[in-house]
Amino acid sequence: MAHKKAGGSSRNGRDSAGRRLGVKLYGGQAAIPGNIIVRQRGTTWFPGAGVGMGRDHTIFATVEGRVEFRKGLKGRTFISVLPTAEAAE
């Protein structure tokens, strides 16, 4: 009678779901107030003109216009929303 001694249970096999971070609106795309542009942990991107930053560092549009990514000082990337001509009138 062949028997096998019971093996121990594995302590692996768990993983957390992805957090869905990253760029949601890219440069040149249209944005309206409240649109989320970037979800991030910490400040990979910094807020520029026409955008705000939430408690969790989410960058969102505060004006209607086009999204722009621009390099700034110290290697920082700033995100702005430039008002479109018809939105400014």
Curated annotation (Swiss-Prot):
Keywords: Ribonucleoprotein, Ribosomal protein. One of its GO terms (biological process) is translation. Pfam families: Ribosomal_L27. One of its GO terms (molecular function) is structural constituent of ribosome. GO terms for cellular component: cytosolic large ribosomal subunit. SUPFAM superfamilies: Ribosomal L27 protein-like. InterPro entries: Ribosomal_bL27 (IPR001684), Ribosomal_bL27_CS (IPR018261). Belongs to the bacterial ribosomal protein bL27 family. This is Large ribosomal subunit protein bL27. It comes from Cereibacter sphaeroides (strain ATCC 17023 / DSM 158 / JCM 6121 / CCUG 31486 / LMG 2827 / NBRC 12203 / NCIMB 8253 / ATH 2.4.1.) (Rhodobacter sphaeroides). The gene is rpmA.
